[in-house]
Amino acid sequence: GLFARQFGTPNYAAHGGFCSVNMAAGMIYSIGGSFWEFGGPDLENAKLFIMMGTAEDHHSNPLKMAISKFKREGGKFISVNPVRTGYSAIADEWIPIRPGTDGALLLAISHVLVNAETFDTDFVAQFTNGPQLVIDAPGSEKHGQFLRADVADKPPIYDQLDQMVWDQDANKAVCMRERPARPALTGRFTVNGLDVRPAFELLKESLADCTPEWAQAITGVS
C-alpha cells in the first residue's frame, strides 16, 4: 500500500495487487476460475513435475516439503529457469531459457502434444472447454463467441453448463449440463443456421505454426 499511496491513489492497495491479482485474472481468462497460487501441483499422483514461469522462491514451505517427498519417491523434477538458483539447483534437470519466453515454449509443447495426440482426450472432452462450440461467422457480431443454450432454443441462463457441445452419439448439439458421453473435439457443424466449431479445433489450428523449431529461435531451448 505504501508504494501505491506515493502516487496519490484513493483506492485500497496492498501487495496482493502485485503478486496475486495478475495470477487470478490470468486463470479466470484461461481456465475459467481461480484459486490461490499456493494451490500447488498434484504431486501425489504425478511422476513428472515441470516448474516454469513462476517466482519459485515465493512458494510456501508446504510446496518445498511436497517436492522433497516427490523426489524421494522417485518423481522426476524439471525446472525451466534462466538461472540455476532456488528450486532449479535441486532439479533433476535444469533447462535454461531466455527470460520472458516461457510462453513460446509452452506453445511448442502444446503443438507437439496436440498433433501427436499424446494427451488425455477423455479428460479434455469432459473437463475443459475443448468441446464447447464456438460460432464461426466472420463479419457477424457473434463470431468467436461460445454457442449458448439460448442460441439453440434453450432457456437463456448464462452458465458454463449452458454452453453447447456436439454430441457424437446423438449427432446434434446439446447443453453441457446434459453431460454427453462423447462430445466432439473436432469438426464443423451447423446449429440453427450458425456455423460452429469446437474450441479444441480452434486451439489446434492456432498452434499450427508453433513448432519446436519456431520456439527454439525465441527461447534458446533446443
Over which residues does each language-model region extend?
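Anionic-ligand anchoring segments at beta-strand to alpha-helix junctions in alpha/beta enzyme folds, i.e.
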Residues: G1-N45
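Short, structured coil segments at secondary-structure junctions
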Residues: F7-G8, E73, A89-A91
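Short acidic, glycine-rich surface-loop motifs adjacent to enzyme active sites
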Residues: A46-D57
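Glycine/threonine-rich flexible loop motifs
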Residues: E56-M65
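A short helix->loop->beta-strand "cap" motif at the edges of active sites that frequently abuts
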Residues: K69-K76
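Short, polar loop motifs at secondary-structure junctions
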Residues: V80-G86
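Long, well-ordered, tryptophan-enriched scaffold segments
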Residues: S88-S222
